[in-house]
């Protein structure tokens, strides 16, 4: 429906059909209830003595003329069964009552004492204001949320209808998910006691004797939280309230008790009765285990270290005695006895055969302190004893090189041994180098290959070859070639071939490079092999 704004003019929809139907229903209900009820309610609303709030509003109006106009307007509206106006479309008493209440609420709209009609002109109080637009008036009735004034009391049914309309206009809450409306079939399956028992079992798993280690992040987080709460309490921002903390139940752990009796070396579980009344042990040959082997090796190493310490004490006495005396061989008989005793301790150590003696000597050289002992002892030894140690080191050079990978301490022996090399004969030299050229059984690699990859090994080998070339050149001018010369030639050719076959990067850099080494190879090998040897030796010497 549309409301009219003067002749031939229309405005927007006044109200929806639901609102008009509600108004008509309300009018019929009010006519059936009787006029007496309405008059009593109207008198109560207009009686200033019964309503103290009405007096306050009348006092707020202030002007007697305005106050009289308000009273006249209310009485006219309540006494007339219906008001007919060009813009009202025959609205009922209750509808006009509600309309007047709405206009009373709207502060921007000026107060109208009477509704305009064609016969009676509109009366204005105060300054003349432009008449409101009926379109705005109609839209306000439907869109503006109603606020009820204390000057008017709505009928209970009318109030209920308005409340229903308000609820229908408010947006409905989002629909719940269909599965949330269904009852949980697994609810209340456990009693409170059973739940507490399950929680206790779960909390027991959180127990720890070392919380800082087992639950570090939770402990750090809770300490920071407690510090923050303490700071807030000091600043007065927070009341002292005990915060929640994870408390695990304390359950004392039973001491570990092992009822099974274990006997070392027994097979399987031993019965308790056997412990109290043991049977005769089975005669069996004991077999060493890996742990026993480790213990034996450890004890043997301790014995070697003890040997070295004892020999070092003897060596310190010798060095202290020769400090202010002339060097050997000008020493007394007592000093010679001390050196001889130390040499025998180093060489034999009460071994019955040569293999055991050599093994004891190698054990001393396998320790860094043992290498230092031999290096400091060599200058005090006689010539024959020093040569004996030199030949032993040369014969077992591959083994010593492998054991020196971690320490790299064999270099301290090169200078003392270099002085001993000059005392070697050609026959002794061939005996020392023979162990480097023999091919071990079950191996395709000669020991000299390992020696060439170590700095001390290749330096000692070059020094021995240089001294052998000097000896051969001296003997060749005096005597005819013999078996030692032939063996020496074969030895040089074999070593030269091994050097030529080895990659240049694998060849170690020597501590000293003899000047007569390349002429030595030129005398015994062909020119092509000499060129290969020269290239490798120069590369190794440069880098």
From Swiss-Prot:
It holds the Pfam family PAT1. Changing residue 280 to Q: In OZEMA4; uncertain significance. One of its GO terms (molecular function) is RNA binding. It is found in: Cytoplasm; Nucleus. GO terms for cellular component: cytoplasm; nucleus; P-body. Residues 161-170 have a biased composition (Low complexity). Highly expressed in oocytes. Residues 28-60 have a biased composition (Acidic residues). Residues 24-60, 159-186 are annotated as: Disordered. One of its GO terms (biological process) is P-body assembly. Its main location: cytoplasm. Keywords: Cytoplasm, Disease variant, Nucleus, RNA-binding. It is linked to Oocyte/zygote/embryo maturation arrest 4: An autosomal recessive infertility disorder characterized by oocyte maturation arrest that can occur at different stages of maturation. Some oocytes exhibit maturation arrest at the germinal vesicle stage and others at the metaphase I stage. Oocytes progressing to polar body I either undergo fertilization failure or, in those that are fertilized, early embryonic arrest. RNA-binding protein that acts as a translational repressor. PANTHER family: PROTEIN PAT1 HOMOLOG 2 (PTHR21551:SF3), TOPOISOMERASE II-ASSOCIATED PROTEIN PAT1 (PTHR21551). Belongs to the PAT1 family. Interacts with LSM1. This is Protein PAT1 homolog 2.
């Amino acid at each position: 429906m549309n409301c009219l704004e003067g002749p031939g003019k229309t405005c927007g929809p006044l109200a929806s059909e639901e609102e008009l139907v509600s108004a008509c229903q309300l009018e019929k209900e009010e006519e059936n209830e009787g006029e007496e009820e309405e008059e009593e309610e109207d008198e109560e609303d207009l009686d200033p003595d019964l309503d103290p709030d009405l007096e306050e509003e009348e006092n707020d109006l202030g002007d007697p003329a305005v106050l009289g106009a308000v009273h006249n307007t209310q009485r006219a509206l309540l006494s007339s069964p219906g008001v007919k106006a060009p813009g009202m479309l025959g609205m009922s008493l209750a509808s006009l009552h509600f309309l007047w209440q709405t206009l009373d609420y709207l502060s921007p709209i000026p107060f109208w004492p009477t509704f305009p009609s064609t016969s009676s002109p509109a009366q204005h109080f105060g300054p003349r204001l432009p008449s409101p637009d009926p379109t705005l008036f109609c839209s306000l009735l439907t869109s503006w949320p109603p606020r009820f004034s204390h000057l008017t009391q709505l009928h209970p049914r009318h109030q209920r209808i308005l409340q229903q309309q308000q609820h229908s206009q408010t947006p409905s809450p989002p629909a719940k998910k269909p599965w949330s409306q269904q009852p949980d079939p697994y609810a209340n399956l456990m009693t409170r006691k059973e739940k507490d028992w399950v929680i206790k079992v779960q909390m027991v798993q959180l127990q720890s004797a070392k919380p800082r280690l087992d639950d570090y992040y939770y402990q750090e987080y809770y300490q920071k939280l407690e510090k923050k709460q303490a700071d807030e309490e000091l600043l007065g921002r927070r009341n002292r309230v005990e915060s929640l903390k994870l408390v695990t139940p304390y359950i004392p752990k039973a001491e570990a008790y092992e009822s099974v009796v274990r006997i070392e070396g027994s097979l399987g579980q031993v019965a308790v009765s056997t412990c109290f009344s043991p049977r005769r042990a089975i005669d069996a040959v004991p077999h060493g285990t890996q742990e026993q082997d480790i213990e034996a090796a450890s004890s043997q190493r301790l014995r070697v270290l003890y040997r070295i310490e004892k020999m070092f004490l003897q060596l310190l006495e010798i060095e202290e005695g020769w400090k202010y005396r002339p060097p050997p061989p000008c020493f007394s008989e007592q000093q010679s006895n001390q050196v001889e005793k130390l040499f025998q301790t180093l060489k034999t150590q009460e071994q019955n055969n040569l293999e055991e003696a050599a093994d004891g000597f190698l054990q001393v050289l396998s320790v860094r302190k043992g290498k230092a002992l031999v290096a400091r002892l060599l200058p005090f030894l006689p010539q024959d004893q020093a040569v004996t140690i030199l030949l032993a080191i040369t014969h077992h050079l591959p083994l010593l090189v492998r054991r020196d990978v971690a320490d790299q301490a064999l270099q301290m022996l090169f200078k003392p041994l270099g002085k001993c090399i000059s005392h070697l004969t050609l026959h002794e030299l061939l005996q020392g180098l023979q162990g480097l050229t023999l091919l071990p059984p079950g191996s395709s690699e000669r020991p000299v290959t390992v020696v060439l990859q170590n700095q001390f090994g290749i330096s000692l080998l070059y020094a021995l070859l240089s001294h052998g070339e000097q000896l051969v050149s001296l003997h060749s001018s005096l005597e005819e070639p013999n078996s030692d010369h032939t063996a020496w030639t074969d030895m040089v050719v074999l070593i030269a071939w091994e050097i030529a076959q080895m990659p240049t990067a694998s060849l170690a850099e020597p501590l000293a490079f003899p000047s007569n080494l390349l002429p030595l190879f030129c005398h015994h090998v062909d020119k092509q092999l000499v060129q290969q040897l020269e290239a490798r030796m120069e590369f190794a010497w440069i880098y």
